[in-house]
Swiss-Prot record:
Protein name in UniProt: E3 ubiquitin-protein ligase RNF13
Lineage: Eukaryota, Metazoa, Chordata, Craniata, Vertebrata
Organism, as annotated: Rattus norvegicus
Glycosylation (residues): 88
Segments crossing the lipid bilayer: 183-203
PTM: Autoubiquitinated.
Cytoplasmic side: 204-380
Length: 380
C-alpha cells in the first residue's frame, strides 16, 4: 500500500509539474494585443496590430465593425468634426487620431462627444505600441467608447486604402482575454490536490518510519529482562567496547544474549534509542515472545549480509548462555559424559558375563517304576 501511495505521489508530482508548465505557457501565449481587420472597396483585407487602452469600455466579443474617418483636427485635443450626418444613424464610425499635443483620455473623450463609437490613436515617427492610460478619474468616468493604439506605418496604410472616403471599412477585433477565474480556479484546485497528496504521503512516511524505528528498538520492559552483573576482579570482561573504559569493582554490566557485556549507562541508550543489536557483533537482542511476529521484518533485514555483518558470529550455544555460565556448563557436560561412559562400561561387562553363563536345561524322563529320571543336558 505504501508503495502504491509512493507511486501515486510520483504521478501527482509529475502531473502538477506538467500542468503548471502548460498553464504558464498558455498564459504567455494569450495575446495581449488586438487586431484591426481592414477591407477596401475590392474586399481585399489586411490585418494591423494594435494595443487596447487601459480605460474606456472593452470591445465586444464579436468585434466592432465601422467606417474609418480621419480626425479633424488630427490630434483631437479639441472638439473634432462629427461623422457624416446622413450615415450617422445607420452606420458605425471610427475615428483615426494622431498622438501628441494632449493626453490620450482627452482625445478619446472628444471623439466620444463627436459621436464616434471607437477611436484609433496612432504613433508618430514610430511603430511602437503604447498602452494608453489616464490619471484623471473624472475624465475616465466619462469615457464609454473603446480605443486602441497603432503604429505610424499602420496608420498610413489605413489612410491610403481603407478609409470611409475610399470605400473601405474596418473591424476592431478584441483581444482574447479570459476571466481570471477561468484559469485561476482550476489551477488552485490542482495545487490543492497536489498539496493534499503530499501531506498524505509525508504523514504515511512519518508513521512508517516511526513504526520501523520503534520495532527496531528495545522497549524498557524488554531491557529489564536482560541480566545485570556487578563486575568483580577476575571476570573475563575488562573494557567496555562503547566508552573504552576499564571495568571497576561494582560497575553494573548489562549482559547481552551474545555474552558481550557493557556498562549499563552505555548500552541501554543504544538498545532503547538506536537499535536492539549488539554494538560489536551486531547480533539481535532476543525479544520477548509477544514481539516475535512484529519483529519478523526486522530480523529478515538483519539476517542479510552487509558491511556491518561480523565475519565470525557467535555460536548458537553462546547466544543462549549468559555471563559466567560457559565454564559451569562445560564442567557439567564433562561430568555427564564420564557418567555415561561408566554406565556403558558396566553394561558391556554385564553383557559379556551373560554370554559366558551356561544355559542349563533339565530333561525329565519317566522310568518304568514311575520315578522320574533327571538328566541334565549342558548346552553352550
Amino acid at each position: 500500500m505504501l508503495l502504491s501511495i509512493g507511486m501515486l505521489m510520483l504521478s501527482a508530482t509529475q502531473v502538477y509539474t506538467i500542468l503548471t508548465v502548460q498553464l504558464f505557457a498558455f498564459l504567455n501565449l494569450l495575446p495581449v494585443e488586438a487586431d484591426i481587420l481592414a477591407y477596401n472597396f475590392e474586399n481585399a483585407s489586411q490585418t494591423f496590430e494594435d494595443l487596447p487602452a487601459r480605460f474606456g469600455y472593452r470591445l465586444p466579443a464579436e468585434g466592432l465593425k465601422g467606417f474609418l474617418i480621419n480626425s479633424k483636427p488630427e490630434n483631437a485635443c479639441e472638439p473634432i468634426v462629427p461623422p457624416p450626418l446622413k450615415d450617422n444613424s445607420s452606420g458605425t464610425f471610427i475615428v483615426l487620431i494622431r498622438r501628441l499635443d494632449c493626453n490620450f483620455d482627452i482625445k478619446v473623450l472628444n471623439a466620444q462627444r463627436a459621436g464616434y463609437k471607437a477611436a484609433i490613436v496612432h504613433n508618430v515617427d514610430s511603430d511602437d505600441l503604447i498602452s494608453m492610460g489616464s490619471n484623471d478619474i473624472d475624465i475616465l468616468k466619462k469615457i464609454d467608447i473603446p480605443s486602441v493604439f497603432i503604429g505610424e506605418s499602420s496608420a498610413n496604410s489605413l489612410k491610403d486604402e481603407f478609409t470611409y472616403e475610399k470605400g473601405g471599412h474596418v473591424i476592431l477585433v478584441p483581444e482574447l482575454s479570459l476571466p481570471l477565474e477561468y484559469y485561476l480556479i482550476p489551477f488552485l484546485i490542482i495545487v490543492g490536490i497536489c498539496l493534499i497528496l503530499i501531506v498524505i504521503f509525508m504523514i504515511t512516511k512519518f508513521v512508517q518510519d516511526r513504526h520501523r524505528n520503534r520495532r527496531n528498538r528495545l522497549r524498557k520492559d524488554q531491557l529489564k529482562k536482560l541480566p545485570v552483573h556487578k563486575f568483580k576482579k577476575g571476570d573475563e570482561y575488562d573494557v567496555c567496547a562503547i566508552c573504552l573504559e576499564e571495568y571497576e569493582d561494582g560497575d553494573k554490566l548489562r549482559i547481552l544474549p551474545c555474552s558481550h557485556a557493557y556498562h549499563c549507562k552505555c548500552v541501554d541508550p543504544w538498545l532503547t534509542k538506536t537499535k536492539k543489536t549488539c554494538p560489536v557483533c551486531k547480533q539481535k537482542v532476543v525479544p520477548s515472545q509477544g514481539d516475535s511476529d512484529s519483529d519478523t521484518d526486522s530480523s529478515q533485514e538483519e539476517n542479510q549480509v552487509s558491511e556491518h555483518t561480523p565475519l565470525l558470529p557467535p555460536s548458537a550455544s553462546a547466544r543462549t548462555q549468559s555471563f559466567g555460565s560457559l565454564s559451569e556448563s562445560h564442567s557439567h557436560h564433562m561430568t555427564e559424559s564420564s557418567d555415561y561412559e561408566d554406565d556403558d562400561n558396566e553394561e558391556t561387562d554385564s553383557s559379556d558375563a551373560d554370554n559366558e553363563i551356561t544355559d542349563h536345561s533339565v530333561v525329565v524322563q519317566l522310568q518304568p517304576n514311575g520315578e522320574p529320571d533327571y538328566n541334565i543336558a549342558n548346552t553352550v
